[in-house]
A protein has these predicted regions:
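Condensing-enzyme catalytic core mediating Claisen C-C bond formation in acyl metabolism
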Residues: 5-9, 36-37, 214-298
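A glycine- and small-aliphatic-rich helix-loop capping segment at beta-alpha/alpha-beta transitions
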Residues: 22-29, 113-127, 177-180, 200-213, ...
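Active-site-proximal alpha-helical scaffold in enzymes
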Residues: 78-91, 140-143, 148-192, 230-252, ...
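Glycine-/small-residue-rich "gating" segment that lines the acyl/pantetheine channel
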Residues: 124-131, 172, 176, 180, ...
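Flexible, low-complexity linker/loop segments at domain and module junctions
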Residues: 1-8, 95-98, 291-293, 326, ...
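Conserved beta-ketoacyl condensing-enzyme motif
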Residues: 8, 23-25, 29-162, 191-200, ...
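ACP-dependent fatty acid/polyketide chain-elongation machinery
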Residues: 1-67, 245-257, 350-364, 407-411
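Acyl-CoA/ACP chain-elongation machinery
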Residues: 182-228, 261-275, 301-310, 327-377
């Protein structure tokens, strides 16, 4: 089968250190953390009191008040990012082409905020007082459906839920659908709004969150000897993918090209990654083969700041690239914004596209005392200008759901 080329023509992002692509990108290049004491609710009863919480985000800048009230916060991020990406792409819709435009998103948790509110309300007020829009508001597919309804997109519409790999998975599947000719355009990415009391209690019980409450901006420290867990974040990353000739014909801005995608399962444990990194290595090898490459110029790592993940990913990178691994810059976006679960891989895809555009690698911050077992070039502390043609982005979700994406300079 003839595989069509797929390019990125629009971006949108909301993250703890910036809403809007240029604001977010500037913060990343400056190594600016968005992690702070949580105030979405009172965290005093929890051992963890910090998060990558987005502040100053106004949903009414992107949707009507009626819509904003009817949807959960994770959908707010999706609608906002969709508007940003579509504005940048200058996509013109007609009744003839809407059936060739898809919406494929990722979310690991869906409408958790509204779900928690309604569970509490139901037990307080009784089961006959349940909000009538509870089901569509909580459902993970609400984000894709709300975007399709708003813009009239009538192609494939779905949400993929593979925990921390959800956003990357969605981008990969959107890439495939365009590549194989099922659609011409797809709005894709990942969104998450996990900052709820239940989620905090659950993740605290798992003992995977950093307890560095006294120094929030230093809490997320991938590959550092003193890392003690990840910091939960929220947000969304959105990309408009388009078949290359379709984009060229309408004079769209071509920001990068998606050239490789692979996914697999580690079949090892619901939370712990395969410690030798074999399955993470296997998915990277498959993505490289899909792109027809043997190496890349930069790796945006999954790099959650947990002992197990950072070590396994380092081993996997070395297994794939051998001695060359020590010459490939690797950095962690999560060091600045925390781990936004299903949105993480999509936000990092935005970072990869911006890195290719500006030929610069954002840093890993808080890498003060490198772990001897994590001995690659993690671009510590300061952004680094670099010649970038191909970049790799890794996303590894709970349940050993592994995804690798490759983005290349637009040609």
């Amino acid at each position: 089968m003839n595989r069509r080329r797929v390019v990125v023509t629009g971006l949108g992002v909301a993250a703890a250190n910036g809403v809007g692509v240029e604001t977010f990108w500037r913060a990343n290049l400056e190594g600016r953390s968005g992690i702070s004491r949580l105030d979405a609710f009172n965290p005093d009863e929890f051992a963890v009191k910090i998060a990558g919480q987005i502040r100053g985000f106004d949903p009414l800048a992107y949707m009507t008040e009626d819509v904003a009230k009817r949807v959960d916060r994770f959908v707010h991020f999706g609608l906002a990012g969709a508007q940003m990406a579509l504005t940048q792409s200058r996509l013109n819709l007609t009744p003839e082409n809407v059936e060739r435009v898809g919406v494929i998103f990722g979310s690991g948790l869906g409408g958790q905020l509204f779900h928690e509110e309604q569970i509490l309300s139901t037990f307080e007020r009784g089961f006959m007082r349940t909000n009538p829009i509870s089901v569509p508001r909580v459902s993970p597919n609400a984000v894709a459906s709300q975007i399709a309804i708003r813009y009239g997109f009538k192609g494939p519409n779905m949400v993929i839920s593979t925990a921390c790999a959800s956003g990357a998975h969605a981008i990969g599947e959107a890439f495939r659908k365009i590549q194989y000719g099922e659609i011409d355009v797809c709005l894709t990415g990942g969104v998450e709004a996990p900052l709820t009391r239940f989620n905090f209690s659950a993740y605290c019980a798992m003992r995977v969150l950093s307890k560095n409450n006294d120094n929030p901006t230093a809490a997320s420290r991938p590959f550092d000897r003193d890392r003690d867990g990840f910091v939960m974040g929220e947000g969304g990353g959105i990309l408009l993918l388009e078949e290359r000739d379709h984009a060229l014909a309408r004079g769209a801005p071509i920001l990068s090209e998606v050239t490789g995608y692979a996914c697999n399962s580690g079949a090892h444990h619901m939370v712990i990654p395969d410690p030798d990194g074999a399955d993470a290595a296997r998915v990277m090898v498959a993505a490289l083969a899909d792109a027809g490459l043997s190496r890349v110029d930069y790796i945006n790592a999954h790099a959650t700041s947990t002992k197990a993940n950072d070590y396994a990913e380092t081993k996997a990178i070395k297994a794939v690239f051998g001695a060359a691994a020590y010459r490939i810059p690797v950095s962690s976006t999560k060091s600045m914004i925390g781990h936004s679960i299903g949105a993480a891989g999509a936000i990092e895809a935005v970072v990869c596209t911006q890195a290719l555009r500006d030929q610069i690698i954002p840093p890993t911050i808080n890498l003060d005392q490198p772990d001897p077992e994590c001995d690659l070039d993690y671009v510590p502390g300061k952004a680094r200008p670099s010649r970038l043609q191909h970049v790799l982005s890794n996303s590894f979700g709970f349940g050993n759901c592994n995804v690798s994406l490759i983005f290349s300079q637009a040609t």
